[in-house]
Amino acid sequence: MTGPARPDAAGAGPSGPVPAGTGPAGGTARLDALLSARGQELLARVAAGREAGQSALALASALRKEYPADLVAAATAQDELRRAAAAKFSRAGRMLFTRPGLEQASSEAAARHRAGRLRAGTAGRLADLGCGIGGDLIALAPGRAVLAVDRDPVHLRMAAYNAGIYDGAAGVRTMAADVRDISLAGVDAVFTDPARRLPAARGPGRRLRPGTSEPPLDWCFALTRQVPAVVVKAAPGLPAGTVPDGWETEFVADGRDLKEAVLWSPALATAPSRATILPGEHVLLPADGDEVPVAAPGPFLFDPNPAVTRAGLVEDLARQLGAWKIDPRIAFLSASTAQHTPFARTLRVVESAPWNEKDFARRLRALGIGAADLRRRGLAGDVDQIHRRLRLAGPHRATLVLTRVSEKPWGLICTDPELP
């Protein structure tokens, strides 16, 4: 088994102070201290204390009697990041993170899915450009030669270390550089995850502008001039028309949570678009077929996964389910029978009628509905305000769908059917 790549210590000794600077030098010194024997001992004690139920504040206060205060602060912060990372990584308790690096990193499931496609479609040496803390490197590196590049020296060292946690350090070579300045000679495939969490990428209200990244996506697409096999991870809100002809856009969801768009160059593309649902790697691809009919809602309603909707595959899903659309421009589907599918939530229709808030409020109360999940699509209105005005009461739960049917405002009261 290959252990984690252990960077050489290059700062203060394990018993000395840990520099508190926020620049590369300070971050590297803190990393050195955490990777020292005493730092590893402290990380283990922090984890054990938290597992035993001690608060972070009380634990840090006790540990400062034995360790430098800066080292305790670094260790407790790292432990918090490891706890947060447990939702993404199965070995998070042994990995190293920064908060920005963790926020941008793919989940382990998404990284493994992507690495599997790359492994099936390419051979030879791979470049991971902008590797961050190694969220994808952990899946790309095992059994393959990988050049990991990042201009942040702390992230680069963490990436190599984390690859070792997943037994992939042997084939990893790291390079501290701006990805735009390196040569790709000898590289057979490229994966890049350009940074999207930039101050300039945020508009009013600090919302991320879709498609804004560093390096820009146009630079990422141009990599095919050097290496034909290129994979780009992007935000799922990618504007229409951003991706060049011949590329595949894959929308990846974790359950019903849309996580990312993955762009596959023409050398790797298998379809114009696809929807992938994790866990389980359920894949929906476009297929030729008859036009999907439009009709009134039937006994069952299907609410497609956001990955299906973003990939433009709602009609493909309808054909797969033998379903119809309830409106030409709305992404709800309906059918006469319940079906279990990973690509949509299935709902049993209890009530279907033109939308009138007062009438539906009375009907919901008559059904004993005390809690309702409101799903609005194609109708204006503040969901929270509507929910308050309904004044629900009762022991049962339902889904209230507010939408359009044949261009008319429509409401549906639905429940989850019992499916095998």
Model-derived features: positions:
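SAM-dependent transferase fold signal centered on methyltransferase-like domains
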Residues: 1-420
